[in-house]
């Protein structure tokens, strides 16, 4: 296990009598980017909680490198509008952080100008970068990013993906990223894992970023994006259970070599 930062082995979680995660196998190595995708209710948030140690699985194991430093970027942050909180004060909630460290982290993510702004007054894109800066302040070996491009347009997504790649290269940290998009992912992703309570399939995203039509559609940061094709041999009902019906379904796909579901 020494080559991994974190490894999940046959992890299963049951909540309120429902199987939320079943037989999950997942690992992230230093410098590796793993993107977790899946529909709403697929168990992505539960898996992240297990990775962060906030939830103990009912069976299976979650192994972490001893003294692993984790930087977590939440999906969103709700701040009371009446709370007098600047970006600097927010970042200084991280133990040991002073103005110099906060300014350096903000500059690294391209948000240096907002350091003294009220956190309630910055844009959604600026908030994403502030949350990313906060995660970096922990000098992480593993970055866990929960839908970091949520609410950002496609051009903004490409820009943020380029930034995340640069941060990975600079800090040599592993990255576990949750994405709401089932097909458009970061091109530098080493592995895409499609989750719907179990691992439906996994693999490397198709590199289409140099296609002229793709570049025209997504602009100068098109190289940051790639398409992921799913390879399922099964479908799920409305409750997430696997449907073993011999009749063909419009959303059932050919089983690929990378599929983890037997």
Swiss-Prot record:
Biological process (GO), any one: response to zinc ion
Matching InterPro entries: AAA+_ATPase, ABC_transporter-like_ATP-bd, ABC_transporter-like_CS, Metal_Ion_Import_ABC, P-loop_NTPase
Residues in ABC transporter domain copies: 6-221
One GO molecular-function entry: ATP hydrolysis activity
Catalyzed reactions: Zn(2+)(out) + ATP(in) + H2O(in) = Zn(2+)(in) + ADP(in) + phosphate(in) + H(+)(in)
Binding-site positions, ATP: 38-45
Source taxon at top rank: Bacteria
Enzyme Commission identifier(s): 7.2.2.20
Location relative to the cell: Cell inner membrane
Topological category with respect to the lipid bilayer: Peripheral membrane protein
Protein's UniProt keywords contain Membrane: yes
Keywords: ATP-binding, Cell inner membrane, Cell membrane, Ion transport, Membrane, Nucleotide-binding, Translocase, Transport, Zinc, Zinc transport
Role played: Part of the ABC transporter complex ZnuABC involved in zinc import. Responsible for energy coupling to the transport system.
Quaternary structure note: The complex is composed of two ATP-binding proteins (ZnuC), two transmembrane proteins (ZnuB) and a solute-binding protein (ZnuA).
Similarity comment: Belongs to the ABC transporter superfamily. Zinc importer (TC 3.A.1.15.5) family.
Name listed for the protein in its UniProt record: Zinc import ATP-binding protein ZnuC
Gene: znuC
